[in-house]
């Protein structure tokens, strides 16, 4: 077909005639009977087919030709539209996230430490004041007074109003002691608990909390600690979490600003004294609660019996948090800062404790060990010297009690302690200076150092029971007589017997 027939309705007619011709020329493709078809019937069929094609052409207005010609173009347009839609959705998502983080980290006067849309949080002072007014209306007198007392404390001592950074002395203590540098210190004025062994806390009948002496460090990526509940009655509420200093310790953690806690009821509190938020399963006796802190992102999370729960606090990077445990009734809680293995496997493997188990400070030497210790060696030598001196003094006292060395009343020549001389000494007048070789000096020195060999004297000196006859001065000296001065003379046996018999006869003769 050429000319106007290619683009007009004639094209369809031509196509129809071609189709009709092909049908007529191929009669074998259609099952027919052996009887010949009349020519009038074939013309009627051709007219019917032409009529149907013309009606379709009129209804679709040339749609057959247009569809076959534009099929490839419409496919490309569909792909382009899909790609542009995907890129547009991504751009919209990026813009929304940018706006969210911009308002989250740059807006002042807004506390947004948790995710948006979570109930139980306050993000500005007006909303908190509205919640406070609603809560005070339904509080009882005791709860209202406790809240007002805590509010007055927070106003007088705002959070982070005192220096809580780790000082140089505290850092050195951590280096020396390791994780043993952390311990719980109860407030003496309001303490209703007792701390034993630095980390074992026993609470009594009233509400109170206890903080550690040191904050959580910020050098590592993650710090983690755990608390195990012992002896918890059903009506006792236990809260484990983190707080800043100063904090009203007569209240549980999580009730006031810059504090968070996981309560034994299964709720959590974050800067919220009025309403708590469901968080996890309730806690009972034997459960272990873990608290993790990521200083770089300011995130705080909890674990229960070794299973991590969702994050609670975000962007708390500037505060110094102290591990805190509180209760309103009798219970016992043991805390593990890393001195033992954690129940949370990840923290146990990655060593997320507050400090190493052992510091650089060496332990004291064990008693009874001989590891070349100077202290133990000197003590052993001192004991030997003391025993030898006691033995020498005992021997000298025994010898000095039996052997009497007559001192000289006149001074002699100067000689060494080992020089023994028994020669007669010249008489020197008493008004002259006796000098170093005087008998007085020798007498004083003689009390400490014997001048004679006691081993030779033991064979020559009589036994201690021997007594010299009366009137004999042998073996006696002034030094030996001095101890007996002031005591009456000892009478002999005969004199004592005679006096006794005389007294008896005299008493018998008297009426």
From Swiss-Prot:
Positions of region (Disordered): 432-511
Signal peptide: none
Keywords on record: Endosome, Glycoprotein, Membrane, Protein transport, Signal-anchor, Transmembrane, Transmembrane helix, Transport, Vacuole
Superkingdom, natural source: Eukaryota
SMART domains: SPRY
Compartment(s) where it occurs, according to its Swiss-Prot or TrEMBL record: Vacuole membrane; Endosome membrane
A GO-annotated cellular component: endosome membrane
SUPFAM superfamilies (UniProt xref): Concanavalin A-like lectins/glucanases (SSF49899)
Gene3D superfamilies (alphabetical): 2.60.120.920
Keyword Chaperone: no
Topology in membrane: Single-pass type II membrane protein
Residues bearing attached sugar chains per UniProt: 400, 499
Record has Membrane as a keyword: yes
InterPro entries, A to Z: B30.2/SPRY, B30.2/SPRY_sf, ConA-like_dom_sf, SPRY_dom, SPRY_Ssh4-like, Ubq-SigPath_Reg
B30.2/SPRY domain: residues covered: 146-342
GO biological process: protein transport
Pfam family, one: SPRY
Coiled-coil regions, chain positions: none
Topology, Cytoplasmic side: 1-82
Transmembrane annotation, as ranges: 83-103
Lumenal topology ranges: 104-511
Polar residues compositional bias, start-end: 437-455
Similarity comment: Belongs to the SSH4 family.
Function comment: Components of the endosome-vacuole trafficking pathway that regulates nutrient transport. May be involved in processes which determine whether plasma membrane proteins are degraded or routed to the plasma membrane.
UniProt protein name: Protein ssh4
Organism: Aspergillus clavatus (strain ATCC 1007 / CBS 513.65 / DSM 816 / NCTC 3887 / NRRL 1 / QM 1276 / 107)
Gene name per UniProt: ssh4
